[in-house]
Amino acid sequence: MNLKLRNIPFSPPDMTEKEAQEVREAILSGWITTGPRTKKLEVQISEYVHTEKAVCLNSATAALEMVLHLLDLKPEDEVIVPAYTYTATASVTQHVGCKLVMVDSQKDNVEMDYDKLAEAITEHTKVICPVDLGGIVANYERVFEIVEQKKYLFKPNNALQAKIGRIVISADCAHSFGANQKGKMAGEIADFSSFSFHAVKNFTTAEGGALTWNLPFGNESVPTDADYMLTVPKKEGETWNELLYRLCQLFSLHGQNKDALAKTKLGAWEYDIIGPWYKCNMTDIMAALGLVQMERYKGILERRYEIVRRYDEALKDLPVAVLNHKGSDHCSSHHLYLVRLLGRSREDANKVIEQMAERGIACNVHYKPLPMMTAYKALGFDIKNYPNAYHLFENEVSLPLHTKLTDEDIEYVTSNFVDIIKNL
């Protein structure tokens, strides 16, 4: 075992001089808010995940909430999320004022229990939010099967919901940018997909996120008299993809019908406020980071694959369970390395985290289930109703996984972890 103390942070951003130079150029260009770099990054993201459009925002949370606004949900409408996730998946329901429904995990699997998901669907269910936890694409085939089976319960409230014709699948892809399943990229599989580009993510714009969608009718024209977003004037010949993109711009910029870039044209000062909406746009400084990260992302992912391979090899003889990041039909983004200490308690797992910290290695936990959190207890959720989610949490430890790790760092992490587990 390597006894020389090292300092191993959990997930620092991987920045180079290239990102610094692009940010400098953005600042000196005089265009630091939403502008040409943001628009360029949107195009690159849509091309990367094979969708017609992408909208850059300031977080995945904003993207997840944007979906609920685009669907124009009502207070009685229900959104189903897993209990085993980060708060953003669920909190957006409270932002828009609809009803939150939680479903337990599968036994020994971080995905939702799909049988329980089917049971949770009612005539009020409008959206299901699967989570690509750790960067592993969820079983969307199963989710689509379930919503087709429950199609008879679906009652649309507007023209967009009616056009979709069933419960909407809004993927929480905060972890899975760059992941794929059965030849499709995260971002093109679900109806709507929300990505996070936060500083701890594989691909980062410091803060930031993006929304993509893939609707079979996206290139069809929207009837000018469509019963949908009645305060927003419809344009003759505008497609659903174009309208949704325009709505995202409105929702992210106070409902203002001209962004700063459009207002730079001579005599184009005048604008209207279509709705009293939000401020969650991406800036060109953030996008500058993203443009360079896109150039580097293939290499970033490949290094993550190698780190996970080395972790798997080092831990293979321990009494632990880890996520399956790569298989014949899928490849995750390799965002998190979750380790469950089989037969151990939360207290045992906490001891491991403390002992790793004493050796300079930062670990984490993904996740404490939402029904254990104060905010969700106050909404009436009880962890006793989500035993599988609790079982996943009770002995979980996340090891550092990032591209600043050297081969020597990986050896240091794994040798210390193995030593601590064997002496626990």
Predicted regions mapped to residue ranges:
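Structural detector of well-ordered beta-strand residues that form the stable sheet scaffold
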Residues: I80, V101, V168-S170, S194, ...
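Glycine-/small-residue-rich active-site loops that bind phosphorylated ligands and cofactors
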Residues: M15, T33, T85, D108-N109, ...
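Conserved active-site segment immediately N-terminal to the catalytic lysine
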Residues: N157-T205, E236, W269-I273, V322
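Conserved SAM-binding loop
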Residues: C56, V81, M102, L211, ...
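PLP-dependent aminotransferase-like
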Residues: H69-C173, N180
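PLP-dependent aminotransferase class I/II
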Residues: K39-V43, T51-E52, D115, V127-V131, ...
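Glycine-rich phosphate-binding loop of ATP-grasp-fold ATP-dependent ligases
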Residues: A206-A210
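Conserved PLP-binding active-site segment in aminotransferase class I/II-type PLP enzymes
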Residues: M1-L70, K74, V143, T239, ...
